């Protein structure tokens, strides 16, 4: 782990994003609404394109101003989280397409996979997509240049006290 | 609500329960680790309940929620309870031994030094009190 510049990343915005993704996907499954799963995919895609959490606006405009969720700003790399969301977008798009094409088991399986990974991140503090990002970085792939914050297991939420 | 929706609802509940069970087993694993490493903190048994609190200097929820909750519980229980604070950034060895993956994390140990509860993330004062009372 070499010296690198970390940025301030608000993990509450990421958590809000994950919780909304989990909720909407479970609702989509219960109500059998592939269109809702497609909407989640779309929001994750927009978020990936804009380099923000897809449902981060809920935190920014509603939860944070009203004090319903407090900021949890940590020194971290934003890139792995963006990559994780992009991976989620790919899975959700594949899941939605499968559902529209009639491959329901595959489709809902992919949707539940996203739910499980988002839950692991939201409740366990482990970001699988981030771990994949750091793992790819070990192979010196272009674009995967960041390393985990010092003292942090790749993919785990930083324990802070982290120095750039 | 159609029968299909009901079926899907219960299926979703089942999947969530399964996930919660996996999480429960993970917590049990953490408690076993804590039990095996309790003597990394004590030379002799504490003879009173202990809260082992893993934190770091820059952890915002630790400062805004967890620290005030622990202060309050210490005020309420006084000498009947011991709180041990560990800076995970200064003692990564201890954090690793105890299986701490995020902060704040609190372990509640009974008077025999046996880890009985683990809270991954913020544990509010009501929850901590409830847990301490069963120790």
Model-derived segments and their meaning:
Chain B
Residues 59-62, 106:
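The canonical Cys-X-X-Cys-His
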Residues 78-92:
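Thiol-based oxidoreductase modules, predominantly thioredoxin-like and allied folds used
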Residues 99-107:
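Structural micro-motif
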Residues 45-57:
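Short active-site neighborhood of thiol/selenol oxidoreductases, capturing the structured segment around
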Residues 109-135:
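Non-catalytic, surface beta->alpha helical segment in thiol-disulfide oxidoreductase systems
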Residues 63-75:
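Typically the conserved alpha-helix immediately C-terminal to a functionally engaged Cys/Sec
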Residues 1-36:
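N-terminal targeting signals for export/organelle localization
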């Amino acid at each position: 782990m070499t010296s690198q510049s970390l940025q301030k990343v608000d993990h509450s915005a990421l958590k809000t994003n994950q919780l909304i993704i989990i909720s909407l996907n479970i609702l989509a499954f219960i109500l059998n609404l592939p269109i809702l799963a497609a909407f989640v995919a779309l929001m994750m895609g927009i978020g990936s394109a804009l380099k923000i959490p897809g449902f981060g606006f809920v935190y920014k405009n509603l939860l944070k101003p009203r004090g319903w969720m407090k900021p949890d700003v940590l020194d971290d790399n934003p890139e792995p989280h963006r990559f994780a969301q992009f991976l989620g977008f790919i899975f959700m798009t594949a899941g939605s397409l499968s559902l529209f094409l009639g491959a329901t088991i595959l489709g809902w399986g992919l949707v539940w996979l996203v739910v499980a990974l988002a839950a692991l991140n939201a409740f366990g503090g482990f970001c699988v997509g981030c771990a994949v990002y750091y793992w790819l970085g070990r192979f010196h792939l272009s674009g995967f240049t960041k390393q985990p914050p010092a003292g942090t297991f790749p993919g785990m939420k930083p324990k802070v006290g982290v120095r750039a | 609500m159609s029968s299909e929706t009901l079926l899907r609802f219960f299926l979703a509940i089942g999947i969530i329960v399964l996930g919660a069970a996996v999480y429960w087993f993970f917590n049990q694993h953490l408690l076993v680790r804590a039990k095996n490493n309790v003597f990394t903190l004590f030379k002799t048994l504490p003879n009173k309940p202990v809260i082992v609190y893993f934190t770091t200097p820059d952890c915002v929820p630790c400062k805004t929620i967890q620290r005030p909750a622990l202060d309050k519980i210490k005020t309420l229980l006084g000498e009947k309870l011991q709180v041990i604070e560990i800076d995970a950034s200064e003692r990564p060895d201890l954090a690793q031994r105890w299986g701490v993956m995020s902060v704040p994390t609190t372990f509640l140990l009974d008077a025999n030094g046996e880890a009985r509860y683990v809270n991954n993330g913020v544990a509010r004062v009501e929850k901590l009190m409830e847990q301490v009372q069963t120790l």
